[in-house]
Amino acid sequence: MSYAAYKMMHWPTGVDHCAAGFVTHSPSDAAAFFTAATVGPGPEGDIDSAAAASRPRRLGPSPNLVVAAANVLEVYAVRAETAAEDGGGGTQPSSSSGAVLDGISGARLELVCYYRLHGNIESMTVLSDGAENRRATIALAFKDAKITCLEFDDAIHGLRTSSMHCFEGPEWQHLKRGRESFAWGPVIKADPLGRCGAALAYGLQMIILKAAQVGHSLVGEDEPTCALSSTAVCIESSYLIDLRALDMNHVKDFAFVHGYIEPVLVILHEQEPTWAGRILSKHHTCMISAFSISMTLKQHPVIWSAANLPHDAYQLLAVPPPISGVLVICANSIHYHSQSTSCSLDLNNFSSHPDGSPEISKSNFQVELDAAKATWLSNDIVMFSTKAGEMLLLTVVYDGRVVQRLDLMKSKASVLSSAVTSIGNSFFFLGSRLGDSLLVQFSYCASKSVLQDLTNERSADIEGDLPFSKRLKRIPSDVLQDVTSVEELSFQNIIAPNSLESAQKISYIVRDALINVGPLKDFSYGLRANADPNAMGNAKQSNYELVCCSGHGKNGSLSVLQQSIRPDLITEVELPSCRGIWTVYYKSYRGQMAEDNEYHAYLIISLENRTMVLETGDDLGEVTETVDYFVQASTIAAGNLFGRRRVIQVYGKGARVLDGSFMTQELNFTTHASESSSSEALGVACASIADPYVLLKMVDGSVQLLIGDYCTCTLSVNAPSIFISSSERIAACTLYRDRGPEPWLTKTRSDAWLSTGIAEAIDGNGTSSHDQSDIYCIICYESGKLEIFEVPSFRCVFSVENFISGEALLVDKFSQLIYEDSTKERYDCTKASLKKEAGDSIRIVELAMHRWSGQFSRPFLFGLLNDGTLLCYHAFSYEASESNVKRVPLSPQGSADHHNASDSRLRNLRFHRVSIDITSREDIPTLGRPRITTFNNVGGYEGLFLSGTRPAWVMVCRQRLRVHPQLCDGPIEAFTVLHNVNCSHGFIYVTSQGFLKICQLPSAYNYDSYWPVQKVPLHGTPHQVTYYAEQSLYPLIVSVPVVRPLNQVLSSMADQESVHHMDNDVTSTDALHKTYTVDEFEVRILELEKPGGHWETKSTIPMQLFENALTVRIVTLHNTTTKENETLLAIGTAYVLGEDVAARGRVLLFSFTKSENSQNLVTEVYSKESKGAVSAVASLQGHLLIASGPKITLNKWTGAELTAVAFYDAPLHVVSLNIVKNFVLFGDIHKSIYFLSWKEQGSQLSLLAKDFGSLDCFATEFLIDGSTLSLVASDSDKNVQIFYYAPKMVESWKGQKLLSRAEFHVGAHITKFLRLQMLPTQGLSSEKTNRFALLFGNLDGGIGCIAPIDELTFRRLQSLQRKLVDAVPHVCGLNPRSFRQFHSNGKGHRPGPDNIIDFELLCSYEMLSLDEQLDVAQQIGTTRSQILSNFSDISLGTSFL
């Protein structure tokens, strides 16, 4: 293997940074949402009244939430659901049954846009000037000194780069002052009034970013086509301040403070650095200095300063007005400073103050604030999220602008947070790398009536490991009240000046959660609970799942990940030659039952030449002979009409309308409705149903419309004249129903009264109006043109010329913009030649348009091409100014009514393309059966199912598409939903092998994630996991922090000499009554129960006090006594007793009990103490390889003893061991990797070669490509290197040195590689491959793979990769080649070969338009189909789960 491909399969989920701001709208836009709903506050005495609880007293304009996870940037909108006043009966039960707080019954995060960047986000802020009609700008900082500003562009419904600032390269080399390595990347902060921003780069270089004057904006002004209702803050220029020239040598933090005419920057710096071991001589070494920034004069005089701050000060918090000033956060104290006053608060007994200081107030409880995250809930209350997961409230008690004191109170518990931000005045967000990130609503004065209802539920902390894995996945309404209780916060012994009372009354409700599976320390590969032992081929991979060690401390969990869905099977029957299935409802009258809970009445099965009908009652019973359905031929489509009172069955030559089982009308189709009855019947190719209309596409390409009459429940046939006179052939068509009393598409009309964000609820009682304008017909012609018509008038309201090309933006051609015309001209010159290759071959075969539930939801448009490509578009509304619209004359067939055509068109309707990871690359016949089936409730989820050779679920969660393939049954011919007594919100599908299966989605999994995930709370930190296949057990190392009395801890160390060297004051009587937190380790053996998917701890192996389990592995050893192989559980441990005690550890071996009735699942068969920490174990040809300290020993097993037979001295500390045949690969913590071989004849471990460089290894593994063996290592600088052993090459120093085959910067710490055999693809002749890819997990929660590829594929894709660097505009202006270069972090390194393909960059090729794809492929000398075939082969070959 000379070449490899790097591919991310599950993107990072651990939140590093978060911020809130009005990015997609201005405060004045958002205020329009709440003007009608917001009621003014009542008098003071009315706070506890029942009426005050149900009305929104504090809900104001809600800003956006911006979240960064490694290189993933996401922008969310907070969607709050207000409770109906006076119990209004029209509200949906799901939206008001949640706990009501401040008039809000529920809230959720809805995705606006997201991007995967070519660089990790080091810091983030939102630049806002506070103006009512101005939007905020997102400022991102990247290594080493790159800053990018992004603002939201309504024209594309996404972020656009407004400015870039780079201080790298030769001209800025002097800024580093000779240094090559920096502990932190740039840190960026914003002025509260948006006048400027500041970024600290290279440790001591302050970059000042000057904001432009009001009205200057890239999006708002420079683009003539964009007319925004509000412009965003924009950076005009930047300049540098050298802090070294200001006598600063060690800057810790900085912040802009409030209340000054000019921006004032306060910098926390250390004059003379010290550390904890020298605090007796140097303790108060920090100080703060406030600089007034004059950007015009580029001057920055010091206006005030404060010295003698503790050395452990690490963070500044600017206090909001009217107080102003700054809080200095230290590990053991909090200090407030302003230009005129100061005060402090001691947090524990470790805090100290300079001599002569006034008396300092102390906190009522002991706490440490190092590594705490903070955000302001109001102008005088700041919330801290501590390193232990506690939430603390600090109240700044003030009189006027004079701060009198600081009061700290305990609040609830929360997740271990990595970032915190307030969102408006009702929410805050806890971002976490170690647990699920939470959206929390808070309220100061919740009424007693509300709190009584909430406190009756079980009490719980605000933690991410409550049952969120199953519940927090859909619209968080009624499910949230079960997992979070809200109770009034009460604090004892607190005096109540200013807002102290409100701090006491703060109540919380967790409203939503973002699932996080990071950090992935280790994972194992095992069988699922519902695995099929008879599965063959690629479908067999759906039997497996990843069981991962996630989280830390109380947020620790076992994350069970599945790349594909394997449904829970209820029943299965053989049904050959099935062509389609449908379920229909039947109502004899309009009942009060909600539509979502109504059971299906009939199952219609279309066979090759007949139709079966089954009743879906308690049992599926065939009623084909007793119903009036047309059963003598196959059915084309079936569905409900007239409010589910009738069933429509469409077959080849006609259609029937049925009332239950009785036919009420039969229609026969002819070529045209106007022709005589003697006309020859015309066959129906496909049909689309949208009550009360049925659209028919005939075999000859014509279109007919069946129009329903609600009064008589009958249909009439209409052939639209616009298509009769048209010469264009129709390739695909569908109907779209714009549901609700406020149809979404109607708001995009040019003559509609538009108000940003009309917030009426969607009608949920089934009585929505049947306005004809709610139904639209979408037609795509063979030429590629797409048109949207009103039904039944068939007046064209939207038209796009080249839909099948997959442009990034779809705009009505009647109101095309100037810049789009100019863009199109770039490709006109190449279209003629390129169209010869693909223009005639690429066709649309199926269309679908659907708007799923949700008050703010928008329609999705899907187009399936005949090569398997699924085009996905999301609709949005954009109102362009009249002066920027270029009128384009319509074609004669473009509209039936030219009079007033401009006013009737959906001129404000646009679609932006959404990336969707569908790997199917199959040739789909033009007249094949439908592949797309939409669903509104399958297991509580909504979306669509894509049948075919590579079936996939496309679930709509938070207005985001989540793609989950279903490969367990091979190709799927037909799919439909089923809801009855025995199958609640399930589904039915028919496989290509002729089996009909009734299934449900596994309820234990959360599908609102990159992969379906189940999180099993451990309430401890998981470290390592392994899999015992014979009994499907998962041994797992878990550590739990335990608080013990200090005297008990010391007594356990009595046999160690360290206890005699302790100072007398440490072992005094008072000190011995203190407590000490120690981590207690144990090995839990977990089993996945077959029914329900619940995990149970079958056995626990406790470790001794101060004994840390470092490794657990299943090993197969050859018993030299019995001459048999034994499968044992091997555990390696280390005693952690401080630096003064010699390291030692133990090796433990356990056997598994075969009997099911045995009380002891495992039995200890061997235990021996080692002189060093046992960090890794592995089995090598029946021997046990043990890494103990700086030595590797190979041992043979006699059944009772381990006997050493060979050893090798490692440099420092072994972090990983890998075995292939008789070869050994191990990674050292500082000295890179070593390649050994085991020779049984001479009983020796001999060194073959090693890497002579310095490398801090994280993980190692072998990469196998046929007969070629490569060695892979990940390091502490987030790189991956591939080495190979070539003793015959001169560069290898006679075979002593491992040579570099490839190197690559991943951007994350990879902690585990797992070698898995690649799957065969259609291009390979043999059924089995001898290629093995490496599946890896990283600390950011990402999962990916490194796969070997052949040279021809590599050359082709490398050429494409180099072309895409220039051909694709990259978000934030980041260079992908620069990001993927090896990062040596200042160490000497010789660049290696560039032999890895970056699929993160290559995936942007599929998002190019068809013309651009053909153009790029032609320029690199290949074809589009060949490139997409290579993509598909690699995706199929790495579908391990």
Swiss-Prot record:
One Pfam family named in its UniProt record: CPSF_A
User: What domain of life does the UniProt record list for this protein's source?
Assistant: Eukaryota
- Offer an example of a GO molecular function term for this protein: RNA binding
**Where in or outside the cell is it found?**
Nucleus
List the PANTHER family: DNA REPAIR/RNA PROCESSING CPSF FAMILY
Query: What family does the entry list?
Result: Belongs to the CPSF1 family.
Q: Which UniProt keywords apply?
A: mRNA processing, Nucleus, RNA-binding
Q: Name one GO biological process term.
A: mRNA processing
Q: Does the keyword RNA-binding apply?
A: yes
Please give the name of this protein.
Probable cleavage and polyadenylation specificity factor subunit 1
Subunit-level organization: CPSF is a heterotetramer composed of four distinct subunits 160, 100, 70 and 30 kDa.
Instruction: Give the matching InterPro entries.
Output: Beta-prop_RSE1/DDB1/CPSF1_1st (IPR018846), Cleavage/polyA-sp_fac_asu_C (IPR004871), RSE1/DDB1/CFT1/CPSF1 (IPR050358), WD40/YVTN_repeat-like_dom_sf (IPR015943)
